[in-house]
Amino acid sequence: MQKVTFPNKILPYFLLAPQIVLTVVFFFWPASQAIYQSFMREDAFGLKSTFVELANFTAVLSDPNYLHSVQVTVVFNVLTALLAMGVALLLATAADRVIRGQTFYRTLLIWPYAVAPAVAGMLWLFMFNPAMGTFAYLLRRNGIAWDPLLDGNQAMGLVVVAAAWKQISYNFLFFVAGLQAIPKSLIEAAAIDGARGARRFWTIVFPLLAPTSFFLLVVNTVYAFFDTFGIIHAVTGGGPAKATETLVYKVYNDGFVNLNLGSSSAQSVILMAIVIALTAFQFRFVEKRVHYS
């Protein structure tokens, strides 16, 4: 591999400058403002802020509604990640076996990733809308009382399916790349030894996909935490009865709807700490178990 050298020593810093500026403006500055606001409390008119130390954090952590949103977030994250990764792996395995029209099938499978989260949510809401949705009509015809606007479990199921559908395409790309990187000689050797399709997959293919699966687990966790706001906002608005109010959506409700900036900032700081701790734990303790030589 040819080594690239820069004759001008300042050029690398100019190339890094746009990314550094974007990171500072859109991450470090908002994060610092959130940390600052989490220790403050505004008056009823928003004219004066008072330093209240850890009162906002204490109020948040003792709030039953916040603890409920933590439970909702855990359920939503686990179900979304499992469904999105499971279906993507199934589709990638099937697409890897297709010979004719392989490019066409793969292109169709990655199109949903280009759909905006809010649009994806509206698509699923229209299909399962209890008043005019096609699938809602089929469910009622089969004796299922379908109404996600009133039933919390049905609402959770709908947003999980919509969020997973949006992420399947992303996972599919990486699983296909991982499958293509597996030497065919290993699979052929296992077939010669008498291992059937399912056994070959679980003993040869799946362990070699562990690094890819770990990477996607981290990505899907972060996705479910932050990038599903548009879906929840479009489909359920956090309802019914806060059944789909995740941590991110509660930050929005408390900060932009109820205008409780101190509590909202404290929640965002806690959420940021949770994601950082969870990601660090995954890389520190899980990553060691997924690499094969």
Curated annotation (Swiss-Prot):
The keyword GTP-binding does not apply. Pfam families: BPD_transp_1 (PF00528). It is found in: Cell inner membrane. Residues 66-282 form the ABC transmembrane type-1 domain. One of its GO terms (cellular component) is plasma membrane. GO terms for biological process: transmembrane transport. The chain crosses the membrane at residues 10-30, 72-92, 108-128, 155-177, 204-224, 261-281. Keywords: Cell inner membrane, Cell membrane, Membrane, Transmembrane, Transmembrane helix, Transport. The keyword Isomerase does not apply. SUPFAM superfamilies: MetI-like. It is a multi-pass membrane protein. Part of the ABC transporter complex UgpBAEC involved in sn-glycerol-3-phosphate (G3P) import. Probably responsible for the translocation of the substrate across the membrane. Belongs to the binding-protein-dependent transport system permease family. The complex is composed of two ATP-binding proteins (UgpC), two transmembrane proteins (UgpA and UgpE) and a solute-binding protein (UgpB). This is sn-glycerol-3-phosphate transport system permease protein UgpA. It comes from Brucella suis biovar 1 (strain 1330). The gene is ugpA.
